[in-house]
C-alpha cells in the first residue's frame, strides 16, 4: 500500500536529498515533523525498528541538507536509526515493505541504493568503514566528504576506539556524529551549547586555533600552557578531552532535535580539516510518548495502532526458547551462587530480565563487546565461578578468536547459550544464525548440543552447566517452543548420545535440532527411520554405524549452513569408519539468507516438512 502523501505537503517535495536541498532552510522544521509522522504511520503498518528512527529525524534531515549525498558519503552504524534516511532517499513509497520478503532491507544496504554506502547490521563498524572511505577520498582529491553516524551504545565496542585511534593518527578529513540518546535533553544542551558549538566550529575559532599551534610549535612550555587553558575552558561545558586525546576536534554536545542548529554547525564543520567529532543529544522515541517513556520496549515493534498508545499484547501461549533459557537460568541460580551469567547487551532478547532483577550480583552486561564478554567468562571460569554466556549466534561470530584462544584452548568450563540459531527472519543476512555449527565444530574440546524441543533444551543446558572438562554450547532457535511436556527434574544427558525416535526402513533421517518435527512428518510419509542426534559434537558414532549398516540412504537435516555443518560431520564420520553410503544433506545453502518471515524462508529453502519430503523423494528418484 502507499500513503496519501498530500497529508505531508512539505515532505512530498523532498523525495530525494537533491529535492530536499532545494527547499529553504526555514521549512526544515516542518520537513522534520512530517517525516516523523510518516515514519510513525509507516512502521505501524509494516512493523520494524521504531524508537531509534524517531530520534534521528532532525539529524537525517540536516545531514542530507548540508552534505551533497550520494557524492558525499554517509555511513550509518548498525542501521536501526536509518529509516528516516530511507524515506528521504527515494524509498518512501516502498517503506511499507521493509523487512518483508522481497521488500526493503531492514538496514542500509549497498545493493538497494547509491545512498547506502556501506551495508550494516552489526554494531561498531561505521568509523572503520568511513575512515577507509575518507582515505580513498583524500587520494581521489575531488572534495568528497565522509560522515559516520554512530550511537552511544555502539561506542561501547572496542572496534570503534581502534578506528578512532587510527583516524586521529592519520588525520584524514572525516566527521563522526555521536548520537547520544542515553538521556533526555538536559539544561546544558540548549542555547549556550548550540551557540558554543557553532562558534568553535566556525572559521574564526579554527583559524586562530591552528595558527596558534604553528606559532607555539617552537615554544613547548607556552604551547602546553595554552593547551591546558583551552582544555580547561572547553572542559567547563563539553566533555572534549577523550576525543581530543585521540586526535579529533570535538564539537558539542548540541541539541540533536534543533534542525537549524544542526545545519549551521554542520556547515561550519564540513570544511574543517582533519577528523572531527560532533556530539549530539537526542531522545530515542522522540515524538511518540509511549516510545519516549519505554525506548527499549519500542525499539522494534509489530504492527500496531498509533492511536492506542500501546503495543499489541500477544495471547498467552507457548514460551519462546529465550524464555525457556531465562527460566532455567533462574532455577539454577537459586541453587548455585557460583553461577554467573554474561550478555553482550542482549538482556531482553536473551530472556534475562527476570534473572538480572532477582540475581543482580550474578548478572553481567558486558555491553556491545562480544570479545570482552567471552574472555570475561574465561576469567570467571579460571577463578572457580561457573559462567554462562547468553549470546546470539550471529554475535558469537564477533568473539570467535576468544572462543578458540581464551576458552577452548584452555579447556575452560564455559557454557554458551546460543540464541537465534538458524533462520531468524526479518532482520536478514546480518542476523541469520547460519554458521555457528560450522565454525564451532572444528574447535577442539568443544561439546555442541542442538535440542529438538524446550524440554531437551533445559536438560542440555543443565548438562553443559555440569560438564567441567571444557566448553559446551547449546544452540536453539528464535521463536516459540514446540509445546513438549516439561520435565522439571533436570538430569545430565550422556555426552555424545542420540536417540531413535522412529524405526522405519531403507531411509535413515539423522536430525539435529528443532527441525525434528518437520523431519518426522516427512519420515511418516516415507516410512523412514529418524534419529534425534542431540549432539553435533561429539557425534554418536555407534548410532551412526548402526543406521548406516541397516539402511540404504542417510539423510541429515539441520538449520545451519550445509558446508561444514552437522551433516558434513556425519559424512566425515562415515568415511573414517570406511562406510560407503549415499548421504543427502539438507540445510542452508551456500548463500546469505535474505530477509522475510521465517516460515516463508523455511518453505523457500525446502526446510519445512513438505520441502524435506520433496528433497528426499528427488534424491531417491
Swiss-Prot record:
Q: Do you know which PANTHER family this protein is assigned to? A: 1-D-DEOXYXYLULOSE 5-PHOSPHATE SYNTHASE-RELATED, 1-DEOXY-D-XYLULOSE-5-PHOSPHATE SYNTHASE, CHLOROPLASTIC
Source superkingdom: Bacteria
Q: Which InterPro entries match?
A: Dxylulose-5-P_synthase (IPR005477), THDP-binding (IPR029061), Transketo_C/PFOR_II (IPR009014), Transketolase-like_Pyr-bd (IPR005475), Transketolase_BS (IPR020826), Transketolase_C (IPR033248), Transketolase_CS (IPR049557)
Q: Please state which protein family the record places this protein in.
A: Belongs to the transketolase family. DXPS subfamily.
Q: Part of which pathway?
A: Metabolic intermediate biosynthesis; 1-deoxy-D-xylulose 5-phosphate biosynthesis; 1-deoxy-D-xylulose 5-phosphate from D-glyceraldehyde 3-phosphate and pyruvate: step 1/1
State the free-text cofactor note: Binds 1 Mg(2+) ion per subunit.
Q: Which Pfam families match?
A: DXP_synthase_N, Transket_pyr, Transketolase_C
GO molecular function (one): magnesium ion binding
Concerning CDD domains, the annotation shows:
TPP_DXS, TPP_PYR_DXS_TK_like
Give the reaction(s) catalysed. D-glyceraldehyde 3-phosphate + pyruvate + H(+) = 1-deoxy-D-xylulose 5-phosphate + CO2
Q: Which SMART domains match?
A: Transket_pyr (SM00861)
Species of origin = Shewanella frigidimarina (strain NCIMB 400)
Instruction: Report the GO terms under cellular component.
Output: cytosol
Q: Whom does it interact with, and what assembly results?
A: Homodimer.
- One record GO biological process: terpenoid biosynthetic process
> Which terms are listed as keywords in the entry?
Isoprene biosynthesis, Magnesium, Metal-binding, Thiamine biosynthesis, Thiamine pyrophosphate, Transferase
- Give a short account of what the protein does: Catalyzes the acyloin condensation reaction between C atoms 2 and 3 of pyruvate and glyceraldehyde 3-phosphate to yield 1-deoxy-D-xylulose-5-phosphate (DXP).
Needs which cofactor?
A: Mg(2+); thiamine diphosphate
Its Enzyme Commission number(s) read 2.2.1.7
The record lists thiamine diphosphate as bound by 80, 121-123, 153-154, 181, 288, 370
Which Gene3D superfamilies does UniProt cross-reference here? 3.40.50.920, 3.40.50.970
The encoding gene:
dxs
Which named protein is this?
1-deoxy-D-xylulose-5-phosphate synthase
What positions does the entry give for Mg(2+) binding? 152, 181
Amino acid at each position: 500500500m502507499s500513503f496519501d502523501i498530500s497529508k505531508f505537503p512539505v515532505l512530498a517535495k523532498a523525495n530525494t536529498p537533491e529535492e530536499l536541498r532545494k527547499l529553504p532552510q526555514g521549512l526544515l522544521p516542518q520537513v522534520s515533523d512530517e517525516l516523523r509522522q510518516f515514519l510513525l504511520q509507516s512502521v505501524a503498518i509494516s512493523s520494524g525498528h521504531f524508537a531509534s528512527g524517531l530520534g534521528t529525524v532532525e539529524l537525517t534531515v540536516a545531514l542530507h541538507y548540508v552534505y551533497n549525498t550520494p557524492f558525499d558519503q554517509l555511513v550509518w552504524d548498525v542501521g536501526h536509526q536509518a529509516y528516516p534516511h530511507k524515506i528521504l532517499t527515494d524509498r518512501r513509497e516502498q517503506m511499507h515493505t521493509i523487512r518483508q520478503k522481497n521488500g526493503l532491507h531492514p538496514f542500509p544496504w549497498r545493493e538497494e541504493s547509491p545512498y547506502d554506502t556501506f551495508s550494516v547490521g552489526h554494531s561498531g563498524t561505521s568509523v572503520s568503514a568511513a575512515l577507509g572511505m575518507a582515505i580513498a577520498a583524500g587520494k581521489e582529491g575531488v572534495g568528497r566528504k565522509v560522515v559516520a553516524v554512530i550511537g552511544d551504545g555502539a561506542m561501547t565496542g572496542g572496534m570503534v576506539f581502534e578506528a578512532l585511534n587510527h583516524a586521529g593518527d592519520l588525520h584524514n578529513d572525516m566527521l563522526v556524529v555521536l548520537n547520544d540518546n542515553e538521556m533526555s535533553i538536559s539544561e546544558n544542551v540548549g542555547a549556550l551549547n548550540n551557540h558554543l558549538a557553532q562558534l568553535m566550529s566556525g572559521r574564526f575559532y579554527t583559524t586562530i586555533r591552528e595558527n596558534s599551534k604553528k606559532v607555539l610549535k617552537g615554544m613547548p612550555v607556552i604551547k602546553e600552557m595554552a593547551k591546558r587553558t583551552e582544555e580547561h575552558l572547553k572542559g567547563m561545558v563539553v566533555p572534549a578531552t577523550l576525543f581530543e586525546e585521540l586526535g579529533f576536534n570535538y564539537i558539542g554536545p548540541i541539541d540533536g532535535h534543533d534542525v537549524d542548529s544542526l545545519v549551521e554547525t554542520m556547515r561550519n564543520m564540513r570544511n574543517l580539516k582533519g577528523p572531527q567529532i560532533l556530539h549530539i543529544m537526542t531522545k530515542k522515541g522522540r515524538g511518540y510518548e509511549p516510545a519516549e517513556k519505554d525506548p527499549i520496549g519500542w525499539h522494534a515493534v509489530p504492527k500496531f495502532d498509533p492511536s492506542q498508545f500501546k503495543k499489541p499484547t500477544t495471547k498467552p501461549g507457548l514460551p519462546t526458547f529465550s524464555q525457556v533459557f531465562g527460566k532455567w537460568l533462574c532455577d539454577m541460580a537459586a541453587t548455585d551462587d557460583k553461577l554467573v551469567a554474561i550478555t553482550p547487551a542482549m538482556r531482553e532478547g536473551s530472556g534475562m530480565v527476570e534473572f538480572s532483577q532477582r540475581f543482580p550480583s550474578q548478572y553481567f552486561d558486558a555491553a556491545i563487546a562480544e570479545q570482552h564478554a567471552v574472555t570475561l567468562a574465561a576469567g570467571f571460569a579460571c577463578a572457580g565461578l561457573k559462567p554462562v554466556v547468553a549470546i546470539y549466534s550471529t554475535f558469537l561470530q564477533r568473539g570467535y578468536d576468544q572462543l578458540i584462544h581464551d576458552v577452548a584452548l584452555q579447556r575452560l568450563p564455559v557454557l554458551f547459550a546460543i540464541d537465534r540459531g538458524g533462520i531468524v527472519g526479518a532482520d536478514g543476512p546480518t542476523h541469520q544464525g547460519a554458521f555457528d555449527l560450522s565454525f564451532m565444530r572444528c574447535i577442539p574440546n568443544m561439546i555442541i548440543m542442538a535440542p529438538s524441543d524446550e524440554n531437551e533444551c533445559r536438560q542440555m543446558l543443565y548438562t553443559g552447566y555440569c560438564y567441567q572438562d571444557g566448553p559446551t554450547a547449546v544452540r536453539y532457535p528464535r521463536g516459540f517452543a514446540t509445546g513438549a511436556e516439561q520435565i522439571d527434574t533436570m538430569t545430565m544427558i550422556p555426552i555424545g548420545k542420540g536417540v531413535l525416535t522412529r524405526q522405519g526402513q531403507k531411509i535413515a533421517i539423522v536430525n539435529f535440532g528443532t527441525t525434528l518435527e518437520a523431519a518426522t512428518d516427512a519420515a511418516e510419509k516415507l516410512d523412514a527411520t529418524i534419529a534425534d542426534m542431540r549432539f553435533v559434537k561429539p557425534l554418536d558414532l555407534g548410532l551412526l554405524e548402526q543406521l548406516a549398516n541397516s539402511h540404504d540412504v542417510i539423510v541429515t537435516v539441520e538449520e545451519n549452513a550445509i558446508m561444514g555443518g552437522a551433516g558434513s560431520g556425519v559424512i566425515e564420520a562415515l568415511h573414517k569408519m570406511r562406510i560407503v553410503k549415499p548421504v543427502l544433506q539438507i540445510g542452508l545453502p551456500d548463500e546469505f539468507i535474505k530477509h522475510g518471515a521465517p516460515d516463508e524462508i523455511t518453505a523457500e529453502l525446502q526446510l519445512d516438512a513438505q520441502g524435506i519430503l520433496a528433497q528426499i523423494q528427488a534424491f531417491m528418484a
